[in-house]
């Protein structure tokens, strides 16, 4: 038994470290925005378009990826995803044309979402019985952030030691992708039985899910929580453009912003949620706290002497948002969704919740290009206050919905 547990945690470590690297390329501009834009010679709008193409395709990939995961070995899918993403990284390292970068973004959507995301969820689920699922998924989130922090810190060290050579960073990440892909093939089990899967209606439960107001509300709670996190990923270029922070310092702050606070936020969010016995109530508090912090953050004048204040406020917002990210799928359990429809429900709320990637970056990129950078960034971060207010209202509505749903389930059980 102890040996099986050790093997389980080793496999979780491999899966988690794969998860910590898989999204670094698509979101690399979160950390190296200025360097990436300079090497590619892109405008803010073009940088936003790269993200928007990736995000738009992801909406389809999240929804349809489960079909692939049910028909192929998770080990093969995870290995394929990591290795192919790494290979395209070497292409990215040549700093190709705008059209080529759009093509690369399309490939990344396929390899990081369509063939990867459902396979990872399935692989983690198969590592243990129901009594360890919470720990498996909780530690996966924390190990993801830890691995990303390790890899990103190493990348920043390479960036600094090589005279801020961004190409070396891309090559380093490309190698890591391929290596972890190989480790995944070696250490992860081949899930047998795909060949004997029963034929099922792929759209079973879709009607039930789409007609549920709770599902739509949960989806939009995730939407606004995720949108805050996505835009806070622009903290680094905001600090360099408005507060004149140095490139190396910006890279360090970017790594902490993107990965460092994730360890603390996600774990704390899970623990507090369990203590409160309601993820929805916890999320409501988080939206309220983020709204207050954002008001202060936007009000900080853009002068270099207040750089540290801006950094502290920005990272504080990110900390709360990562706590939100760690638990914003938990309301699906509180909604008492029938187990046979849970996969469909998760797919639908993912499409709604991650929709900001499809358009926010392009919208805000155009806003910043059309205004002064200071004004553009203020508008961008200021809009998040409204997002948090809407999130607060939606979670309040959800709490009432859940009370009604719990009463209905209790009444049905009593009959």
Which residues fall in each region the model found?
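Helix-to-loop junctions at the C-terminal end of transmembrane segments
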Residues: 61-73, 265-278, 368-369
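A late C-terminal transmembrane helix in Major Facilitator Superfamily
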Residues: 334-372
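Cytoplasmic helix-loop-helix junction between adjacent transmembrane helices
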Residues: 105-143
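C-terminal transmembrane helical hairpin of 12-TM major facilitator-type secondary transporters
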Residues: 279-328
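Juxtamembrane intracellular "pre-TM" segments in multi-pass secondary transporters
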Residues: 1-5, 191-218
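Glycine-rich segments within core transmembrane alpha-helices of 12-TM secondary carriers
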Residues: 134-156, 350-361
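Extracytoplasmic gate region of multi-pass secondary transporters
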Residues: 29-31, 213-266, 325, 360-361
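Cytoplasmic membrane-interface "Motif A"-like loop-to-helix N-cap segments
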Residues: 71-82, 274-288
